[in-house]
A protein has these predicted regions:
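Short beta-strand/loop segments at the ligand-binding rim of alpha/beta enzyme cores
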Residues: 32, 183-186, 264-274
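N-terminal signal peptide c-region/cleavage motif recognized by signal peptidases
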Residues: 12-15
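Generic hydrophobic/aromatic pocket-lining and core-packing "Φ" positions
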Residues: 45-46, 130, 172, 176, ...
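Sec-dependent signal peptide recognition
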Residues: 1-8
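Preference for extracellular/luminal or secreted protein segments
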Residues: 18-50, 250, 262, 280-370
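Alpha-helical scaffolding within the catalytic cores
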Residues: 40-46, 217-224, 256
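Enzymes and membrane/adaptor proteins characterized by extended Gly/Ser/Thr/Asp/Glu-rich
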Residues: 50-170, 190, 195-209, 236-251, ...
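Phosphate/pyrophosphate-binding betaalpha-module
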Residues: 179-188, 211-232
Length: 370
């Protein structure tokens, strides 16, 4: 398995960046994934992609409209046509009420129904989702949700597979197998599990009193098991008082160390969206939140979705540029922060190469055994 070769992986990352000289601005920009308005690339978006060296974009139906399959393909082609490192293109194509692309795309049943399907049917569904998204130029699906069903809350409910960790693991593994067969990256979310809380992080900071020992047996079990089958994990904006009572998971060095060391995970760590109210209530600015997330160990900062909740507006593109400038200036003055930027930049490049997003001719010819 790939994760057994961590020391060689780190050497590879160092060699990877030695082949091509990248500016600090490019390195910082690769950690940004943004959303935007409209079904075409505007001049403003093109300028931001160019100046900030954006690492990825995410599509939303409430921002980009009801895109047909041909429109998705054209938009993705436009985004990838600009100079610089090719970008991640992502979507939340979970199924049920969270299926961002519907026009011409197969209808995906909500996750709570999946336990009624056979393993082969789950794999086939994963392959179909993967095929349709890849044809549209999409490389990442923020799915499956592997939070356990919380029977006392309607927060995620139909978006979750089951209240049984074993059932979640088996079904999610089949879906991820289907994704991977089609070359689509699946992202398991929302680590360590919203099933342990009742509050909505879009609006406030969820806090759980659940003991860490119980989390290990229940909510964390799917993440620990499935981490060996995925390239990426998304962290949640929630506090587990028994593990790190001070910081939300996305901003917790202790939680990120658990992912890297205890779970032996060397893939990408995505934050949940930093425009959520839980983040904006805890941090004085998005600049501060972004710095804290990177210092904690995040590889990709997600600036996607509604801000504030219910407004159907995403973060203005000039704000993205301002945040990028702040992070770049900090990296120039802080060697420790610069090292974190370079680690996450290298990890992004490695996985873009591994999954065929980044042209291999631009990288060193080092092969990597999985």
């Amino acid at each position: 398995m790939f994760f057994k070769f961590l020391p060689f992986f780190l050497l590879y990352l160092n060699g990877l960046c030695a082949q091509v000289e990248y500016s600090l601005e490019e390195k910082v920009g690769q950690l940004f994934m943004i959303s935007f308005h409209g079904n075409e690339v505007t001049e403003e978006l093109e300028e931001i992609i160019d100046r900030v060296h954006i690492g990825g974009v995410i599509y939303f139906n409430f921002l980009n409209g009801e895109l047909s399959r041909s429109q998705v393909e054209r938009l993705s082609h436009q985004i990838q046509s600009f100079r610089g490192i090719p970008r991640w293109i992502a979507v939340d194509q979970e199924g049920g009420r969270v299926q961002r692309l519907t026009k011409g795309f197969s209808k995906i049943p909500e996750a709570s129904f999946w336990k009624c399907m056979s393993p082969n049917a789950i794999v086939a569904m994963g392959e179909l989702i993967g095929k349709e998204l890849k044809e549209g130029g999409i490389s990442i699906n923020f799915s499956p949700v592997v939070d356990l069903t919380n029977l006392n809350s309607n927060l995620l409910h139909s978006r979750t597979i089951s209240s049984s960790a074993d059932e979640v693991i088996a079904i999610a593994k089949s879906l991820l197998f289907g994704f991977r067969h089609e070359g689509l990256i699946g992202v398991i979310k929302h680590f360590p599990g919203h099933g342990a809380v009742n509050e909505d992080s879009h609006k406030e900071v969820p806090v759980t009193e659940k003991k860490f020992s119980l989390l290990l047996k229940e909510d964390l079990a799917p993440f620990i098991c499935l981490s060996q089958h995925v390239d990426a994990i998304m962290t949640a904006h929630m506090i587990v008082k028994d593990f790190d009572p001070k910081f939300m998971v996305s901003f917790s060095q202790k939680w990120n160390a658990f992912i890297r060391n205890d779970m032996n995970f060397s893939g990408l760590i995505f934050t949940d969206s930093l425009v959520m109210d839980a983040v904006q209530k805890e941090y004085e600015s998005l600049e501060t939140a972004a710095i804290c997330a990177i210092e904690a160990g995040a590889d990709v900062l997600l600036f996607g979705g509604e801000s504030p909740v219910g407004s159907k507006k995403t973060l203005p593109l000039p704000r993205i540029e301002a945040i990028h400038k702040t992070l770049t200036e900090k990296a120039k003055k802080d060697p420790v922060f610069l090292k974190r930027i370079e680690e996450s930049f290298s990890r992004n490049l490695y996985f873009k190469n591994k999954r065929g997003i980044f042209p291999s001719a631009q990288l060193c010819q080092t092969s990597f055994a999985e």
